[in-house]
């Protein structure tokens, strides 16, 4: 431990002393013998330099005198202090230091006391073990004595609830009497339990009989007398599974038919605006389909107003593509001048804009079915006015 040479600085060499190898402690300045590798007072190793302020030599002399008379109490405190201050390399077997030092100084004083202590401890250990064994042996006896008065003091009500226990404590004379009391008292509740079970079994069988008859009617091929109940249950389960699969297939077919034939009929509200009316009512009614188209388109494009359009020759076509219904209104050119020309101009312009926007939308979807009506129809409508 202490013989290692640190690479940073060379180890100090002790000064050669002319006193036959006696060396002074660097902490407490006590002159130690040549054989001692530690200071006999402060346990500092030989050759260490702790750079502490040295204690007065008078105090050291007093401590040495006290040490030979009686071991001083201050020695341990001083040793703890030096242990804290010393580096790790300088600690050497501190646990064995007391024994080494005391054996060197007082070879005969400490050992007999220790031997006496060890002998006393051994005797104590043996006595403790014996006491523990005695306690362990006494415990089951105490338990037996505790159990017996309780068993004697049992009431007949408790005895009815308990099961017969012939194995426990056969030595007692009271036990067979108690068992003889218990047995006649316990048989009636067992009989009652059996009767109750039989009643419940009968009730369950009565409930299950109509169900079984119903199942036999539904499944006559499984109700044969040769079939075991387990086989019947398996066959019924298979039939239930088949019925579920058939229902699922039917529902799928129905859904497919619905998806293949979507309803292309327009809604009656949008389909049936009144086509032919007098001029003031026609204007108000003609704007309604236009409003619905603007709601669907959500974008009104500003276009120049067309004044040469006849409002009364309105023809509407409804086209449904999926969920969207587009109403297209067709107008013919104006042939006669009416007194309500200004009002018809404004309404016809709005409806013409809607017609253009809706037709563009339908052509984008590739499903425009609007066909321009013939002149014959328009002339016929004009005649009805």
From Swiss-Prot:
Its localization reads:
Nucleus; Cytoplasm
Q: Where is the composition biased (Low complexity)?
A: 160-192, 337-361
- Gene Ontology annotations for the cellular component aspect, listed alphabetically: cytoplasm; nucleus
Q: Where is the composition biased (Basic residues)?
A: 266-275
Recite the UniProt keywords alphabetically.
Answer: Apoptosis, Cytoplasm, DNA-binding, Metal-binding, Nucleus, Repressor, Transcription, Transcription regulation, Zinc, Zinc-finger
Q: Mention any Pfam family matching this sequence.
A: Zn_ribbon_RanBP
Q: Which cysteines are joined by disulfide bonds?
A: none
Name the domain of life this protein comes from. Eukaryota
Ranges of Basic and acidic residues composition bias in the record: 74-85, 98-138, 193-221, 233-253, 362-385
Q: Does the keyword Ribonucleoprotein apply?
A: no
Q: Where is this region: Disordered?
A: 1-23, 63-317, 331-385
GO BP field? apoptotic process; positive regulation of DNA-templated transcription; regulation of DNA-templated transcription
Question: What does this chain do?
Answer: May be implicated in the regulation of the transcription as a repressor of the transcriptional activity of E4TF1.
Q: What is this protein called?
A: RING1 and YY1-binding protein A
Native source species: Danio rerio
The encoding gene is rybpa
């Amino acid at each position: 431990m202490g013989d290692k040479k640190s690479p940073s600085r060379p180890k100090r060499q002790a000064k050669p002393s002319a006193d036959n190898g006696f060396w002074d402690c660097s902490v407490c300045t006590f002159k130690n013998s040549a054989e001692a590798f530690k200071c006999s007072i402060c346990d500092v190793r030989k050759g260490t330099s702790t750079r502490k302020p040295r204690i007065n030599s008078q105090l050291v002399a007093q401590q040495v005198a006290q040490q030979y008379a009686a071991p001083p109490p201050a020695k341990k405190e001083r040793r703890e202090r030096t242990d804290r201050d010393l580096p790790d390399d300088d600690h050497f077997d501190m646990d064995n230091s007391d024994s080494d030092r005391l054996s060197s100084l007082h070879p005969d004083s400490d050992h007999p006391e220790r031997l006496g202590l060890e002998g006393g401890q051994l005797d104590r250990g043996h006595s403790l073990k014996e006491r523990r064994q005695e306690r362990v042996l006494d415990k089951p006896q105490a338990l037996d004595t505790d159990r017996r008065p309780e068993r004697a003091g049992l009431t007949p009500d408790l005895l009815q609830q308990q099961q017969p226990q012939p194995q426990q404590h056969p030595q007692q004379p009271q036990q067979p009497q108690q068992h003889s009391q218990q047995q006649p008292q316990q048989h009636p509740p067992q009989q009652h339990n059996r009767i109750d079970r039989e009643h419940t079994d009968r009730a369950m069988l009565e409930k299950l009989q109509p169900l079984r008859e119903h199942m036999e009617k539904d499944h006559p091929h499984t109700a044969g007398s040769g079939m075991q109940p387990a086989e019947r249950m398996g066959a019924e389960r298979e039939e239930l599974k088949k019925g579920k699969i058939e229902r699922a297939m039917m529902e799928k077919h129905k859904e497919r038919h619905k998806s293949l034939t979507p309803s292309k009929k327009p809604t009656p509200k949008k389909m049936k605006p009144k086509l032919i009316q007098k001029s003031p009512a026609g204007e108000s009614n003609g704007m309604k389909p236009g409003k619905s188209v603007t709601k669907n388109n959500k974008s009104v494009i500003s276009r120049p107003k067309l004044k040469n359009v006849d409002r009364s020759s309105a023809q509407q076509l409804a086209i449904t593509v999926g969920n969207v219904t587009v109403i297209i209104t067709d107008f013919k050119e104006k042939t006669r001048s009416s007194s309500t020309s200004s009002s018809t101009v404004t309404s016809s312009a709005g409806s013409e804009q809607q017609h253009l926007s809706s037709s563009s939308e339908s052509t984008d979807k590739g499903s425009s079915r609007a066909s321009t009506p013939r002149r014959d129809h328009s002339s016929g409508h004009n005649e009805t006015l």
